Amino acid sequence: ILIYNADGQIVDSWTLGFRSAHGLSLIHEQGRDVLFICDYRSQSVVKTDMNGNILMRLPTAGELGIYEEPYKYLPTGTAIASNGDIYVADGYGASFVIQFDRHGDYIRHFGGRGKKPEHINQAHGIAIDGRSIKHAKA
């Protein structure tokens, strides 16, 4: 992670040792900035402070028992709702979106590969606006 000031100068850098970091969300909560970082190779989604301290690690699909083939969980992006709910896009895996509450507790998952309107093929990224969840279909 490289942190720049407004003049474009690097003021800090750190690493979590991820080999395939992919997807980064920056939010402001409780008076501080935090990051949500995905690493699809290790099936990890972590929340960190701006110094790289891990504040939370979300459970994997395998740990939750929600995928028939847990190795197909490859998270690529996150979006955080105004109520703190965390949405994880499984872009390189089974193409589900997994919803957690602000504490990292599983709520539900939806989407997945298929040809019906409710399916998502390659849920690579995700964003939330004030009205609804938006996702890109590939």
Regions from the language model: what does each represent?
Residues 1, 43-46, 55, 95-97:
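Structural signal for beta-propeller blades
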Residues 5-9, 49-53, 101-105:
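Short loop/turn segments that connect beta-strands within beta-propeller blades
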Residues 9-15, 56, 62-68, 108-117:
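A short beta-strand motif characteristic of beta-propeller blades
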Residues 17-33, 63-85, 115-138:
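Beta-rich, blade/repeat-based domains predominating
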Residues 37, 88-89:
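Residue position within the beta-strands of beta-propeller blades
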Residues 40, 83, 91-93, 131:
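Short loop/turn segments immediately following the C-termini of beta-strands
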Residues 42, 72, 93-94, 98, ...:
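A detector of repeated loop/turn-to-beta-strand junctions in beta-rich toroidal repeat architectures
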